[in-house]
Structures are given as C-alpha cells and as structure tokens.
C-alpha cells in the first residue's frame, strides 16, 4: 500500500540510519538536520558514491515538505534537450515525437522537493531556466506559452568543483 511505502521511505531516510562515526560525518549530519527544517535551496558536493542522494532524501523526509513528492533527476544521464523536457515538460507538438503533453519533474515536485543530481553537467542555458524557477517560481513547458507556477524546494548535488567551473564560465555564479 501507499501508506506502507511512505513509512518505509521515511525509515530509510531517518538520520540514525546514516551509518558512520567520523567527526566529519557528524558535522555534516548536524548541518543536514538544521537545513532539513528550513526551506532553503541546498547544494551537496561530494565524490561519486559518497551518499549525496541519501543525504538529499534525509533532508526531504525530515522537512516540512516530507508529505509531498521527492522527485529525483540525474542531469548527467540525459542530453540537454531531453533534460529540459524532463524538467519542464512539453506540450503536444513541441518537437518531433512529442505526440502528447507531458508534465515535467518541476510540476511533479510541486509542494515537495526536486533533487537534481550531477547539476554540474547541466548546460548554461538549462541553468538559466532553473534559476528562473528558483527566483520567480515559474516556467513554461517546452513549446508552451502558458506560465506555470510551482512551489518546489531544490536540492542539487555534484561531484564537480563548481567554484572553478564558475571561474571558467561553465557554471552560473548566481545559481
């Protein structure tokens, strides 16, 4: 049942289920517990396989948005045009093969949390569109003219060195 699934998900993301006793991990968990209670956008940086998605899930499932959707997108797994369609959705006929309207991940996460994994792989154009959603809480589906409003908390993760990417113009400083 859906209720049993929700209980299971909450149990997975309980802070005491994140295993580790190092001082560094305890510092991270202290920060994560504080961040979970806020509504702020979060950036998680760490090497591949270090549990960034687990931390993102713990933040969501211990937040005021925990009763709403936790939607995950791996930005590195999709080409730019597919990523934009995945994030923002598209209208019927927006591009070849768009035979019906599709709701994007931002709409699916409305009221909840959107987790963007490997955000450092995102193009500057898509970064600008993400920034608009963060600042204005609105966007249009691909091929659409109607502005849609959403209330989404964004948690992003990367294994990249974003400060050096900002310096080289590969990543937006304001994002």
Language-model segments: residues:
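Residue-level detector of conserved catalytic or cofactor/ligand-binding positions
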Residues: 1-11
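AAA+ ATPase active-site-proximal loops
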Residues: 9-149, 154-160, 165
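Basic, amphipathic DNA-recognition helix from helix-turn-helix-like DNA-binding domains
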Residues: 170
